[in-house]
Structure formats: C-alpha cells, structure tokens
Amino acid sequence: MASSPLGNNNDDFNNENESSKKKQTVCVIGAGISGLSAAYLLHQSNAFAVTVYESEPTAGGHALTREKSKHAGELDVDLGFQVFNLTTYPHLVGLFEELRVKHEQSDMSFSLQSERTEWGSLGLSGIFAQKRNLINPKFWNMIREILKFKKVKHDVLSGSKKEYWEKKTLGEYLRENGYSDYFRDHYVLPMCAAIWSCNDKDALGFPLKPLITFWANHHLLEIFERPVWRVVKGRSKAYVEAVLKALPDGCVKTGRYVH
C-alpha cells in the first residue's frame, strides 16, 4: 500500500473518478498471481480503488504461456506455473471457481532413468519397470528407505526439536540416519532436481524442514496415494486473462517499474 508510489505515475492516482475518491486508494506492486489475486479481492470488497504496477510488459509473472505457432502439432507451453491439485491449493481452486476458469486432469508422474536403473511412480508396473529390480536387494532397500523417509514428516511437522530441524540440511540428515547412497542417488536427489531444477550439491545443502514441509504438503512423500494433478484448460494465460477481465479497465499498468 502506498500513497505516492513513483515519480510520473502519480497522475494515475490523480485521475480517479468521483466514486473512487470515496474509497481508500491501494497500490499493488507486481502483477503476478499474488498481486492480481490481491487486487481482485480488494476490488471485490468495493472498499478500495486499486492500481497494480508491473515492471514487465505483460501481467502474469510466473504464469507465463508461450503460445503455439501456426505449425500443425504444436502446443501452448507453460514455462512457470503448470499444475495444481484440489487438496493443496484450496484458495487457488476457489478463485478458479469464482472466475469460472476451467481445468482438467493432467497426465503427470515421476520417473528415473540412469545408466543401470529405471523406475517410475505409476503403479507396480512403473516401480518395477526393470524386471531385474524384483531381485535387486539395493532396489528393495530403496523402497524400504522411501517408507522410512516418509515418516520423518511427523517429526519435522510436530513442532518438537524446532531448532534442530531448522538447522539440519538434507545431506546431514541422510548421512546421520544411515540412508544408503543408492536411495540418495535414485530417489531423493532426482526428486529435488525434478522439482527445483537444482544440482546435487545444492539439493544436499537444502534446509530439511522447508523441504519436508513442501513434500508433505504436495503428497510427494507418498508412493501410491498421490493427488491427481490438474492443469488449467487453455494453460495459465487463461486464468490470468480471467482475473484481468474481472478488474476495472486500466487499473493494471504494465511496463511501470517501481523504485
């Protein structure tokens, strides 16, 4: 919130109509989904005159869709926000329902292929994609360690030993609790790389508490009982356009850098 945001942009506030002058003026910095949803809720309350400033030439932020060209077979691709589920994102789902943004089930799974090992998360046929893993003791031990690692969420999220969990890194925890290199290299590190596009060194240096909290919230510690992931029909640009349509004309000002 600001009364005088930036240089020449003060004119945007001075040009409010008579009805807006009776409302409290609010400036939202950034037209990503957080800024747009905040502006939408403020506008819906009918108590605020909202102006949104975005330094980029377009609104959306992390929700960025690269549209297909005219070539046959090409698809629109989301570069940032891609999927959500009905369990972890109740507020986002509520926003979609209010704006009548359509969504559909996504085909999403996890799989690993290394020089000697392959496995995936889609049922037993995926886990044992390589039949030789049925008699591979290292692979079976990895399954046991996945189940063991799943239980750490109860300790991390219980609130006990708060300082311990906040200081402990992923690498330290794995070493101190006897997890195998096979489990680390064929489960934990590939999962981190898939989610955050990070290298092994960075992943092992992650603080354990936020990592486990994120995995637990997204049901990534489960092997079979994972949520159904969904995607916005028409990609993320569709919900950005829906929010913009629900806001007053001209209240979102792109290409305006706030100092």
Q: How would you name each of these model-derived features?
A:
Residues 1-25:
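Eukaryotic N-terminal low-complexity, Ser/Thr- and Lys/Arg-rich leader segments
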Residues 21-52:
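N-terminal Rossmann-like FAD-binding beta1-loop-alpha1 element of flavoenzymes
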Residues 43-69:
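Glycine-rich FAD pyrophosphate-binding loop
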Residues 51, 104, 251-255:
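General small-molecule cofactor/ligand-binding pocket signal
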Residues 62, 208, 232, 236:
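Conserved donor sugar-nucleotide recognition element shared by glycan-biosynthetic enzymes
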Residues 65-92:
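N-terminal glycine-rich dinucleotide-binding loop that anchors FAD/FMN and/or NAD(P) in oxidoreductases
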Residues 86-213, 217:
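Mobile amphipathic helical/loop "lid" adjacent to a hydrophobic cofactor/ligand pocket
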Residues 213-259:
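Helical element adjacent to the flavin cofactor pocket in flavoenzyme catalytic cores
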